[in-house]
């Protein structure tokens, strides 16, 4: 590349090379964004009528990873409200233990915790299948158990122990919902469920085109029915119309309200209406799926800023698409996701230095 066109001047110098690299990087990012957008358009075009929940074969098997005794009962209680009582299927309790020097002691703690939640569920005439699992990677352990038990969804507590990790998603939650394309419900319950007075649900646009639309809607409708509390859905008019039709036909006794919310920028205003005895539910989406939007990247910041201390469910529904590659034992518990803007900005800063 060091071809001199004159003394001290080269045909291709470092500035030209840097420019070429920047153009290649830019075109790669733009092409991936266009491909993703085109895939969403094709999906919407081919799915004029949403696929309804399979009425002939419900695959419901709820997996509940538990770790903290003070929180396990509320997770099991919520799972009991969400389950289909007519199927009378067992709940699955899971405790994952690190493969370290404290493994044996933690195994025994896990067994005692699972025995407790089994007795708690039995008091409501619900059976539980349990397992204490040893793993070097918590997310990997949950994913493997999910497949072994042929589970349909995961109900898990949100990260609340700042002494373990200061990150909003904790050590492994983000790896979990990125690595599974099945329904994952993350819970933060600050009070007993039977004291809740209202459920408020935020639904993204195009959520009706996702594979798991009717699954999460059915779960929330059951909870509202059992608690006999009012449930209010916030979203686009076309999405609310389908929700209204489903609730009216399948759960006519549920008291449901509907409020139009055209953009996720309305979350701060909605926060003013969320009381301490409300359950705030956010239906979100994974990157690359039909209902995903860039505004959802800041979901964790929005929740910390406006919904701190509130009862909360974050739902990642069943969604089309392949999950990320299987994690290995060497993979870290938590993997960060960076936007294209962050990647380009980081590269430019390095070049300037």
Enumerate the language-model features and the residues they cover:
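An acidic/histidine-cluster motif and surrounding catalytic segment
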Residues: 293
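C-terminal functional extensions of proteins
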Residues: 316-319, 323-353
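Structured cytosolic domains appended to multi-pass membrane proteins
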Residues: 53-274, 280-289, 308, 316-317
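Membrane-proximal cytosolic interface modules of multi-pass membrane proteins
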Residues: 39-57
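Structural signal for the N-terminal portions of transmembrane helices
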Residues: 1-38
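Substrate-engagement module of ASCE P-loop NTPases
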Residues: 301-308
């Amino acid at each position: 590349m060091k071809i001199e066109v004159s003394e001290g001047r080269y045909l291709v110098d470092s500035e030209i090379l840097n420019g070429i690299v920047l153009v290649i990087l830019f075109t790669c990012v733009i092409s991936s964004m266009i491909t993703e957008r085109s895939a969403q358009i094709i999906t919407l075009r081919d799915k004029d009528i949403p696929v309804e929940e399979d009425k002939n074969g419900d695959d419901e098997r709820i997996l509940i990873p538990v770790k903290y005794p003070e929180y396990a009962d509320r997770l099991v209680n919520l799972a009991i409200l969400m389950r289909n009582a007519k199927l009378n299927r067992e709940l699955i309790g899971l405790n994952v233990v690190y493969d370290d020097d404290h493994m044996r002691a933690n195994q025994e703690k896990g067994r005692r915790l699972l025995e407790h939640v089994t007795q708690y569920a039995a008091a409501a005439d619900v059976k539980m299948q349990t397992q204490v699992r040893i793993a070097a990677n918590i997310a990997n352990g949950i994913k493997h158990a999910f497949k072994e038990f042929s589970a349909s969804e995961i109900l898990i507590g949100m990260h609340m122990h700042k002494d373990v990790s200061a990150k909003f998603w904790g050590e492994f939650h983000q790896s979990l919902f990125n690595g599974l394309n099945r329904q994952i419900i993350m819970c933060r319950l600050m009070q007993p469920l039977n004291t809740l007075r209202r459920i408020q649900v935020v639904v993204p646009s195009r959520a009706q085109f996702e594979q798991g639309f009717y699954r999460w809607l059915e779960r929330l409708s059951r909870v509202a029915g059992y608690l006999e509390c009012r449930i209010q859905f916030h979203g686009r008019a076309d999405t609310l119309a389908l929700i209204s039709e489903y609730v009216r036909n399948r759960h006519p006794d549920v008291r449901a309200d509907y409020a139009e919310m055209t953009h996720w920028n309305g979350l701060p205003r909605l926060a003013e209406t969320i009381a301490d005895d409300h359950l705030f539910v956010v239906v979100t989406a994974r990157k690359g799926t039909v209902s995903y939007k860039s505004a959802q990247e800041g979901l964790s910041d929005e929740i910390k800023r406006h919904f701190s201390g509130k009862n909360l469910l974050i739902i990642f529904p069943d969604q089309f698409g392949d999950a990320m590659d299987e994690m290995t034992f060497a993979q870290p518990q938590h993997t960060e996701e960076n936007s294209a803007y962050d990647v380009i900005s980081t590269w430019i800063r390095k070049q300037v230095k």
